[in-house]
């Protein structure tokens, strides 16, 4: 029987469709799905949809709003949580511009003749990020930071023809999990390098020992670390060491921090990756975010880059024009021999980042980074005044993320703060060398002194102060 809410479920229509594709029944289409989780046609009528009747638009909206009302929102104060994405203030103009019809698509502008505006916006994104990172070539986006790390590892293997990548033991576990999945498919071994327990800096002696084995394709580091917050002062020495050993240096960065830190181009990075989320994308459960990927000017590297590249040229009449370039690297040309299987990407998010960077300019971005530094250090100072709290735990300098040691289990403290309306930190128990009492806290320009004081006072009460 035809189901009122499932299109093309009438038997005559189904039979015609099945005959056209050469199968005898709907079951043939789902043969690979375990029968225990498959909904049979006989069960369609029992689907818990609506009120036993079609709903009006107003009724549907009321139902959706009821469901959404169960969500918890953290705006005052914003969450004190980072770990790879961060609470940032997003100017209203960003959403206003990227929701224009000219931009509102995630699809690739293959037909350059009718996509000049979109392509120019992506070219501007590439140019702005290249200036920020001081790297010569930037692609038009990957999915997120994790996928960018994975692609960088695969690229390093192709360039060096080696199959081992070194990472610090405090590498963001979410980035590591995804990157390791990419690496496994490429036959790459990911190996951890020791980190100093006091400073959070990479251990140069352990790094040199591992590099001496001679099969290292790349070293990956984060600057600052997205899971400890530490700005590693050994980063340049580590980069020089891996270059001396014949490997590539991959540096993961938080882009706003680059307004006040030495950028990867000046730190000797061959490949720079990161997430554009802080550049006007806000916080969303699962995204969409923006994978940043850049390389220095080297033909070996550029030819092995993943993802779209937008270039500027002139048309047959001498007018400035934009087009996708070096497409022979890509899947729609090379298929299985492409540098990556990414095609359609996060172009809309890249345009959002371009709007944000254009709006703030160099001075505005610097002010955001400085405000984050000030607020996070204010928070660390206030927290250190609480009895039994050590903040920051690691000695290395930080900008917005920092580790804290509490006199109680960090997971328990986090749950109790959540009950009081504050989402605070990431418990670090079980991660690297941290204990169950350790937590990663994040404070950015989106927080005020009032927000920090509220956190400190509530934590004091949770700790029994």
From Swiss-Prot:
Catalytic activity line of the entry: N(6)-[(R)-lipoyl]-L-lysyl-[glycine-cleavage complex H protein] + glycine + H(+) = N(6)-[(R)-S(8)-aminomethyldihydrolipoyl]-L-lysyl-[glycine-cleavage complex H protein] + CO2
Gene3D superfamilies given in the database record: Aspartate Aminotransferase, domain 1, Type I PLP-dependent aspartate aminotransferase-like (Major domain)
UniProt organism field: Aeropyrum pernix (strain ATCC 700893 / DSM 11879 / JCM 9820 / NBRC 100138 / K1)
GO biological process terms, semicolon-separated: glycine decarboxylation via glycine cleavage system; nucleoside metabolic process
Enzyme Commission no: 1.4.4.2
Keyword Oxidoreductase: yes
MF term (GO), any: glycine dehydrogenase (decarboxylating) activity
Family under the similarity heading: Belongs to the GcvP family. N-terminal subunit subfamily.
SUPFAM superfamilies: PLP-dependent transferases
EC category name: oxidoreductase
Self-association and partners: The glycine cleavage system is composed of four proteins: P, T, L and H. In this organism, the P 'protein' is a heterodimer of two subunits.
InterPro entries the record matches: GcvPA, GDC-P_N, GDC_P, PyrdxlP-dep_Trfase, PyrdxlP-dep_Trfase_major, PyrdxlP-dep_Trfase_small
Function: The glycine cleavage system catalyzes the degradation of glycine. The P protein binds the alpha-amino group of glycine through its pyridoxal phosphate cofactor; CO(2) is released and the remaining methylamine moiety is then transferred to the lipoamide cofactor of the H protein.
Tagged with keyword Oxidoreductase: yes
Source species, domain of life: Archaea
Name assigned to this protein: Probable glycine dehydrogenase (decarboxylating) subunit 1
UniProt KW keywords: Oxidoreductase
């Amino acid at each position: 029987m035809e189901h009122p809410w499932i299109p093309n479920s009438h038997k005559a229509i189904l039979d015609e469709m099945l005959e056209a594709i050469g199968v005898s029944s709907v079951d043939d289409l789902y043969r690979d799905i375990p029968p225990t989780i498959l909904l049979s046609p006989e069960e369609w009528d029992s689907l818990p949809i609506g009120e036993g009747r079609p709903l009006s638009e107003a009724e549907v909206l009321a139902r959706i709003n009821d469901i959404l009302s169960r969500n918890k929102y953290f705006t005052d104060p914003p969450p004190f949580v980072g770990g790879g994405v961060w609470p940032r203030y997003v100017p209203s103009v960003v959403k206003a511009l990227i929701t224009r019809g000219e931009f509102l698509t995630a699809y690739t502008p293959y037909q350059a003749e009718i996509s000049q505006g979109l392509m120019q916006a992506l070219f501007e994104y590439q140019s702005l990020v290249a200036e920020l990172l001081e790297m010569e070539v930037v692609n038009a986006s990957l999915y997120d930071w994790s996928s960018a790390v994975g692609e960088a590892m695969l690229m390093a293997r192709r360039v060096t023809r080696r199959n081992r990548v070194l990472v610090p033991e405090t590498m963001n576990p979410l980035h590591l999990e995804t990157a390791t999945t990419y690496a496994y498919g490429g036959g790459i071994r990911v190996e951890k390098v020791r980190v100093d327990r006091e400073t959070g800096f990479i251990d140069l002696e352990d790094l040199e020992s591992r590099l001496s084995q001679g099969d290292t394709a790349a070293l990956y580091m984060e600057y600052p670390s997205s899971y400890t917050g530490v700005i590693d002062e050994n980063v340049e020495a580590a980069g020089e060491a891996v270059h001396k050993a014949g490997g590539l240096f991959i540096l993961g960065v938080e882009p706003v921090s680059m307004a006040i830190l030495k950028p990867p181009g000046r730190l000797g990075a061959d490949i720079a990756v990161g997430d554009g989320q802080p550049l006007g994308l806000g916080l969303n459960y699962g995204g969409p975010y923006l994978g940043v990927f850049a390389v220095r000017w080297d033909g070996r590297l550029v030819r092995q880059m993943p993802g779209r590249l937008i270039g500027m040229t002139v048309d047959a009449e001498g007018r400035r024009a934009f087009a996708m370039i070096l497409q022979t690297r890509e899947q729609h040309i090379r298929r299985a021999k492409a540098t990556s299987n990414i095609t359609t990407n996060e172009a809309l998010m890249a345009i959002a980042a371009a709007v944000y960077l254009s709006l703030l300019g160099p001075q505005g971005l610097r002010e955001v980074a400085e405000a984050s530094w000030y607020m996070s250090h204010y928070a660390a100072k206030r927290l250190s005044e609480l009895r039994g709290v050590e903040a920051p735990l690691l000695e290395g300098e930080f900008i917005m993320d920092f580790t804290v040691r509490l006199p109680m289990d960090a997971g328990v403290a986090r749950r109790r703060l959540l009950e009081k309306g504050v989402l605070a930190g990431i418990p670090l128990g079980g991660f690297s060398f941290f204990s169950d009492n350790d937590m990663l806290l994040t404070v950015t320009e989106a927080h005020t002194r009032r927000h920090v004081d509220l956190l400190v006072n509530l934590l004091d009460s949770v700790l029994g102060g």
